[in-house]
Structure formats: C-alpha cells, structure tokens
Amino acid sequence: SSDYTSGRINTAGKFSTTYGRFDIRAKLPKGRGSWPAIWMLGENIGTVGWPLCGEIDIMEHVGYDDNGIHASIHTKTFNHGLNTQKTGYTTLSTATDSFHVYSLEWTPNYLRFFIDQNPYFFVYNDSNGDVEKWPFDNPHYIILNLAVGGDWGGAQGIDPTKFPMKMLVDYVKVYKKTELQTDVNVTFSVDMKNVNTNGTGIYISGGNIS
C-alpha cells in the first residue's frame, strides 16, 4: 500500500472545450515531495490514448524547487517519454505564500502561458496539420491536482513535517472570444480643391465619411 494519498478534481465528461482564455487563481503548497498541477487533457484520451490526445500543463510546481513554475505541452511527437516535450520555466518567489493567477491563451495558432498577466512561455503551431505535433484543435478538459511523491515530485524525497499539504484554488474562469464583424464598408468623399502640396507630401483636408 502507498504511504500517501493524492487528490484530483477534473471536468472530464462535464466540461471540455477548444480554444479560449483560462484563468486559475491558486496558492501552491509548501514542502518537499509536493507536486501540484493545473492542466488539461484531450477528451479523446479514451480512444486514442496518451500522448496523442494532447496535454497542456498550465502550471506545474515541485516542492523541492520552491520558486520554480513550469508550463509544458505533450504530444505524440513532443512528450516527456521521449524527452522532447516543449517546456517553459520561470520563478515566482511567493508561489507558496500568496495567490497568483495562472493563465493559458489558446488559439488555433498558438498557446501562450502567463502568471499574473505576465507571459513567459509561447508555443507556435507550426505543425502543418500534423495531429501528432498539434492535437490542440480538439476539446480538452481541465484537471486540478495535488500529487505527493512520484518520479518528479518525489525525486528528492518527501518531507513528512509539511503535512497536511494544501493547494488552494480561488477560482477557475474560462473565456471564449466572440465572433466580430471584420468587414466594414467605408466611403470617403474628398473635395479635391482642398489639396496642399509641400516638400514632405500631399495633404488632403475636408471630406465626409459614410
């Protein structure tokens, strides 16, 4: 039997989506051995398996690196099993002392990751339609978890004096971009008598926009 129990909640079967802005305000746990994560998995994992389904790690933290914050993507081509995953890293001195907003901006063309509105990791879609490189045109669901130990979180052991460990989540917000009218018809009529020419250019004044 295991000495520790990890906790997870997810939206599988309840909420999945493609593209948008995802904001999660959270305070991370202290202690060597903790491994909190805010991430997403492709809802087709049951049929195509991992990593072809795609994985987006909005935030990962390991307790032995107090200030380190990671963001990653995993696909069939780019994943930790092959040691080819695409990963961003930054430091946040108050990650375990204060709440911060961890964000993902997901479009058909890129994934961009933020902490408190500050971007620190960007992945551009240069797959040319290859789903093994970019499975992120399919719906994903959200996962919030606090693991204890494991290959990464437990790489330097577990500090039993830090229990109980808690990852506190204030909110999870998802925003979808609305469709905007991009075609605007403009007619600009000019009285050509109001034309002035000098050494720097031609200036036309007066007119009506309709």
What are these language model-derived features?
Residues 178-182, 204-207:
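Polar low-complexity intrinsically disordered regions
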Residues 44, 188-195:
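Short amphipathic, basic-aromatic surface patches that mediate peripheral association
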Residues 1-180:
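GH16 jelly-roll
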Residues 195-210:
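Aromatic-rich carbohydrate-binding modules that target alpha-glucans
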Residues 181-187, 197-199:
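Short coil/turn motif common to extracellular beta-sandwich-like domains
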Residues 24, 184-191:
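A short, amphipathic beta-strand motif
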